[in-house]
Amino acid sequence: MSEADAATSAMDSAAEAAEQVWKHPVYGATDKYTPGIAPIKAEYILPKPASGSVAVVEVNDDASERLTKRALATTGDSASVTTNTSDEAPKKLKGAARKRARREEAAALAAAHRAEKKCKAGQQTQHAKKGGQNKARQFSSLKDAHGHCHGFLSRGVQGCKFAQCAQACRFSHDLVSYLEKKERDLFLPAVPHKQLDAMSHTQKMQWLQDSYSLTLLPASNTSTTASASTQQLEAQQQAQGEMTTFVRASSSAAVPPRSDLPASSDPAHASLDWSTTCPIFAVKGFCTMGWKCRFLGSHVRLVGASSLGDPLNPTGFASSGLELVRDQARMDEWRARTRAFELSHAKQSASDADQDELNFGTSDGMKAMRKRNFPLPKTKAVLKFLETETKQLADVDPHGSIAGKGPIPTSVVEEAVAVSAGANGCNGHSTAPASAAAAEAEAEDDLEELENAMRNRGLHARVAQAATTNGSIDLARIRPSEKRRLNWRGELYLAPLTTTGNLPFRRICTGYGSDIHCGEMGLAESFLHGNAAEWSLVRRHESERIFGTQLCGGKPDLLVPVAEALKAEVGDGLDFVDINCGCPIDLVFNKGAGSALLDHPTKLSKIVRGMNAVLGDTPLTIKLRTGTGAKQTTHKIFAKAQTEWRVAAATLHGRSRKQRYKNDADWGYIATCANTLRESVSEWNESSRFADEPEMVPIPVYGNGDVYSWQDYYERIERTHVDGEMIARGALIKPWLFTEIKERRDWDISSRERLDMMRKFAEYGLTHWGSDTHGVNTTRRFMCEMMSFTHRYVPTGLLEFLPSRLNDRPPLFRGRDELETLLASSNAQDWVKLTEMFLGKPPQEWSFTPKHKSSSYSTDDAAEQQG
């Protein structure tokens, strides 16, 4: 071999070695960049505050006030402690008195030591307020219409079955008294939604310039009402406090100001703002909240006087002098819209055309779950099969280290369904939840026979074979039901984000280009109890092209029935179901769920195989971490995830449970796990045991961790050869990251564009949670939750060095304009002020406590709790 060839070979070996040890990008220090510090240009950096301006936290000494001054003054010197503070020499004690005095001195010293430790702990606690989490946060539920019938106010006579006889209803149907006490309408400028979609980039920027100011404007700029006098407006502003905003009143040519605003001095109409815009009515042509809407003036018609204005001749609905408006042309246009996802026509109801959200559980199903009699025939059969299999495997291996392989036979599920259907048919009942208890009682004998049939299906022969080969039961030849394949290659996956990954936020990400969405993590036990809040997590917007939900649980007895209930209630509304095997929080881990499943692969095997059996053709995916501690163990799960468990896709977060979000994600280990899975599939295809089986195609493997720029995304794809990447914190801080990745550019997004994103979230939130008082304040709360992450974004135009890094913390800086500076504020009160620009002033009793006490990017105690 020549010297040149030897040199080339050495270089190749070095390159291969570098590939093997690569874990994550390493960016060394330069003249413009120091790792850990965002490289902001000098002209935008603000001087550090003087040390004298930093507030000094006083230590609470209440716990030590009971001690004598002498004991407090001599905490560190035990020899000088005494209870006598006079100038005279201490009296010499003898016998029992001296022993008693020594005990008192020792007790005083111990108390002083405890007080000192408590004071230090208090100082550390005050210190920790700069980081960590605000646990046990409480959010009050604020509602209006106390004592009034909510159904009647929302849907009129169709909303209350006692509408024809109001005296029979426990709640008041007096609409006039409700309007008289109702708070004044909120003001929201009109937005030309249809025209915005057709605008060019230049036209959109002009519209943003017309709609938002870069400097503060007076509050009177946004709300001018023809029906309110100047004195009333001044009194209202004085009562609410001075408010400033960056939102201009509608001055765009696309939405000309209304000149036909009605005028009324009727006391029942004093709360109406005729110039406001209801975001629901503006899009759909009708408002689902009816009279409860906080933007009521935009969709009512003045027809005359109310019973307060003219007691003898009241007009309008319920003597209110008003009528609700329905714009038929807008409704027809809404119903004829194109959707990214819709159910088959056979599964749509008549009201689905008016809904832009799917996956509503049935009222009968939720009621049956709360009563614990929801029919679960598949679950019962599958759990019996797994129990039988476990007992027989225990004969081979008493330690329980052998797990079952392959899918559960489809005949087990089919026979269970047939038995359940036959039991219901004999009694003349359908398989409705109401008759579930009777059906289960009558089918008990048949299920016992089914269990015996399963035991006689050749399992004993397989156990004998396993005993001689030290293997486990092989059911791989039993073909599962036909699953839908997940052809994910390069799709942008938005992670399931607890609290922040709500439907309005997912709609924001859809607009920026995300492809796959997974709903917030739901607890299996709460699903089984029919908890309405938990079942709302599976809600899907029609713009979400690929959508699944994530379940968290620690036992097959919990997760398998939830999977069957989801399939029965939601059906094709879910493209996949995901199992959370990565949640690091103690509350979940201590119950054996989340990342605790990583240490129990046998139990995880039962969960996956059982859920796969009851989900039918719905794919099942898993989300994992590298392990629970420093030792990385997840590659063992990847070796069997597809070949033995039939998982449809797998996502790996490159950190352990102990790391939470500390340190960099280990993408080298992600590559190792992806290769392990593909090698296991290759071995399965080459094995003669499965020669008559269809060739297995490797499932999609996604990586997760620290993706914050398009450069990060494509570098990891190239080095690890994963099928795609899941994006979590990067999307929370800058949701437009999906656009940057697809267009391969660094987007220096303007402050006006970011404020318009807040406007969209407000509209999406009001559409999702409702435009009544409760919905407005729920939207306000989750808007603040979103800003607790978006404020961490450092504008691209302020950086000396690109790309930006997720864990780089910026020094104190100012933006290029007042609005950009406000959007970067870490003060929660500033976030509330931003919500006021679209949702009005919050009630006095409303408050927001941020989940994270600081804007730190990576701390031990302030880690985000997304699995």
Curated annotation (Swiss-Prot):
Residue ranges with Low complexity bias: 225-240, 247-258
Subcellular location per the Swiss-Prot or TrEMBL entry: Cytoplasm; Nucleus
Renumbered zinc finger spans (C3H1-type): 149-173, 278-299
EC number: 1.3.1.89, 1.3.1.-
Gene3D superfamilies documented for this protein: Aldolase class I (3.20.20.70)
Keyword NADP found: yes
One example of a Gene Ontology biological process annotation: mRNA processing
Catalytic activity of the protein: 5,6-dihydrouridine(47) in tRNA + NAD(+) = uridine(47) in tRNA + NADH + H(+); 5,6-dihydrouridine(47) in tRNA + NADP(+) = uridine(47) in tRNA + NADPH + H(+); a 5,6-dihydrouridine in mRNA + NAD(+) = a uridine in mRNA + NADH + H(+); a 5,6-dihydrouridine in mRNA + NADP(+) = a uridine in mRNA + NADPH + H(+)
InterPro entries from the UniProt entry: Aldolase_TIM, DUS-like_FMN-bd, tRNA_hU_synthase_CS
Region feature (Disordered): 71-94, 225-269, 842-867
Keywords assigned: Cytoplasm, Flavoprotein, FMN, Metal-binding, mRNA processing, NAD, NADP, Nucleus, Oxidoreductase, Repeat, tRNA processing, Zinc, Zinc-finger
Compositional bias of kind Polar residues: 75-87, 855-867
Family: Belongs to the Dus family. Dus3 subfamily.
Protein's UniProt name: tRNA-dihydrouridine(47) synthase [NAD(P)(+)]
Native source species: Mycosarcoma maydis
